[in-house]
Amino acid sequence: MRLVLSLGLGSALAIAVVAITPILSERTQWARALHAELEGLISPLSTKEITILALSSGLAEEMFFRGAMQPVLGLLFTSAVFGAVHVGPRKVLLAWTTWAFVMGLSFGSIFELTGVIWGPVLAHVWINQRNMTFIRRH
């Protein structure tokens, strides 16, 4: 039952984030700037490479941050560290750091609520794959 809840919440989160990404990119300066910055990194990647990157990063980050770190250090601190590792070399990427902190809180809340890592893993992989694909295509 907890697995089903975790996967359901992860799916709902992923659907919401993937749906809001194009809206934010169209309507907010910070999302447009972030999109433009990441486009140079993502546009050369093939669909296969994006999928491998999404799978490996989503699984590894969730296992480390939610699976290993959060039970010891708590939701807020783990989310702050998650955001901090998403710091880029340019100021425009500060929005990515903030977004990563919020996503860390979201992934971590699903884990806190259910005690199951697979919903956050599903959400993280899904969001990464769809949003990288969106950035590459637009």
Model-flagged regions — what are they?
Residues 1-57:
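Juxtamembrane helix-loop-helix connectors linking adjacent transmembrane helices
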Residues 30, 41-138:
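Transmembrane helix-loop-helix hairpins at the membrane interface
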